[in-house]
From Swiss-Prot:
Region feature (I-domain): 116-246
Chain residues that bind Mg(2+) 1: D27, D80, E152, E154
Protein name per Swiss-Prot or TrEMBL: Flap endonuclease 1
Species of provenance: Methanobrevibacter smithii (strain ATCC 35061 / DSM 861 / OCM 144 / PS)
EC numbers: 3.1.-.-
Amino acid sequence: MGVKLKDIIQPEQIDFKDLKGRAISIDAFNTLYQFLSTIRQRDGRPLSDSNGNITSHLSGILYRNSSMIEKDIKPIYVFDGTPSYLKQETIDQRRQTREESEKKWKEALAKQDTQEARKYAMRSSKLSPYIIESSKKLLTMMGIPYIEAYGEGEAQAAYLVENGDAWAVASQDYDCLLFGAKRVVRNLAINSNLGDLEYYNLKRVLDELDINREQLIDMGILIGTDFSEGLKGVGAKTALKLAKKGELENKLAKLQEESSHDISEVREIFLNHNVNTNYKIRWKKPAKNDIIDFLCEEHGFSQDRVSKACDKLKNLNSSQKSLEDWF
């Protein structure tokens, strides 16, 4: 998912203590997919309650956020809105991949090949209206604010950083940098196997590559984005060489000849995305009893574990601090 920039940008390693007291805008869809993909049983089956409702995402939301809040990290979730029509091809491709993976997952289950089953199960994850709405419901009970983006959640999350409402964006996708996020944190997981936290400062990234943001966006378009296919044979390293030689425009012109849509529209999505500016951010006192009723009574969670997780939410108390106190 997203633009493949890993080969040309180097992260800084940071620790959770470096995020203490910080507000972090979290790409909700990206994070929910992560929960649904990784929080599964050995054979790839997602966690579910007695009625067959998936609960992997609820487990992830409760335990990851309670651990972050215990470390004095303040999450703000950002949910995607209506996708651009330019993203439809990517959406269709992902749907096809999920369907094919689900078929292979079931075949592996029939063969009792748990390793293969889990591999394909992770690729079959999808966000249903139930998963999205139940996630918002739990976040509200936990006192964690969320914002509805008009379009791409990554663009909205980047805007929160630009506007001073969050310190960094948390997402696995490098697209956040193209959307102008000043700071990006990857692998924001507690006790996961995703590896160490990775931190990217946009200004430092651009300085080290000796390019500007507009060039980074054009490089992304040549590599390929969620909104358009790239130019065949052009990866991150080749795109960077083209930028250094001043040949981006020539290659973009060639790509435009092959493309069915106006590439300038893709550039505009990254440079001037329509964002929601009418929002309020407030962390509230968690509703512990409601959380226990929702997770334990409705979805069969362990009351002891849920209660302990709720106790970690004590930093979100009724005496609300101002945003400035978190920076």
